């Protein structure tokens, strides 16, 4: 019974063979999912019906989850403030998460770093609270989606944001980078 659990940090960290169905878990009180599936090499199960509405940090959540490629479009991430390295080195992840309300997120550094397959639209994201986009799309070899609608006026850090993102060829002329 997970109905009273508030912290799931590192729950399946480095559990290389874990690939069980946990889709029915009650996660409605969880506030911390950081590193939950980090380096869970085999995990590729549905989580789309999870209630993540109270989660504040998803830092490293799927970092190195090299097999994971499941829809997450139903997630309510409106309370999340930290998505640093969330999909870093999640090599197969390529799902549409454009519907996410990321308006409270401050840190998106390394979020898709080395997510080699990721190439989904993110133009509907409200990134107006984000301050750190360091290496956000670094080594995303396939990513080439429009981001010109983003309000990046609070962003301070963009080092290597598109480093080795060899497919990226989008106009960013509407970006206000005066705080960088």
Predicted regions and their residues:
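Negatively charged
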Residues: 1-180
């Amino acid at each position: 019974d997970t109905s009273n659990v508030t912290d799931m940090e590192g729950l399946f960290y480095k559990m290389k063979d874990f690939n069980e169905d946990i889709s029915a878990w009650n996660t409605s009180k969880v506030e911390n999912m950081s590193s939950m599936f980090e380096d869970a090499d085999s995990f590729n199960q549905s989580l789309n019906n999870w209630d993540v509405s109270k989660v504040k940090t998803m830092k490293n959540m799927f970092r190195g989850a090299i097999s994971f490629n499941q829809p997450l479009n139903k997630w309510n991430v409106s309370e999340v403030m930290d998505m640093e390295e969330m999909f870093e080195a999640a090599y197969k992840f390529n799902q549409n998460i454009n519907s996410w309300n990321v308006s409270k997120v401050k840190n998106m550094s390394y979020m898709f770093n080395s997510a080699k397959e990721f190439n989904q639209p993110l133009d509907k994201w409200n990134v107006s609270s984000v301050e750190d986009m360091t290496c956000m799309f670094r080594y995303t070899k396939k990513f080439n989606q429009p981001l010109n609608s983003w309000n990046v006026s609070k962003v301070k850090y963009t080092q290597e944001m598109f480093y080795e993102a060899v497919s990226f060829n989008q106009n960013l002329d509407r970006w206000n980078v005066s705080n960088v």
